[in-house]
Amino acid sequence: MCGIVGALSLPGASLKMTESYITTMRDTMIHRGPDGGDTWIAEDATIGLGHRRLSIIDLSDAASQPMATADERYWLTYNGEIYNHQEIRAELIALGYSSWKTNHSDTEVILYAFAEWGIECVHKFRGMFAFALWDATLRELWLVRDRIGVKPLYYSTHHQRLVFAS
């Protein structure tokens, strides 16, 4: 089971996101992802994402998170498993998505599914999941979990920040 964390500075907040803030959040869940961890902080330091990794589907470093689309518009930290990710990937390839950095990462499928279909992509997913997806162009954060809530996702506001974790 992976661990995801993040924080978004609320409008008017004077606090900027720091790597140490996200890293501290992330590493409190080291038991949820012993295979590695990473963080991403936006250039303007208004949002940060973190991930503790338990490698299951794609064991390569290319599948590390947080992960971004090639144009870095979308950023994702994700925990779970999309059982039908190969079918969705084939559909995306048929639509012209031909540049993949991983061979079979369901994380990358979520990113490009969101790029193609927006939030409606979740209706295609069969599995258990929780994720945070940042749209850097629209400056929107999506916090999403599976229909039943198998993968937890908690959030709160704290010191002018929306904070969240699995």
Give the location of each predicted region.
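Cysteine-centered catalytic environments shared across enzyme families
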Residues: 1-166
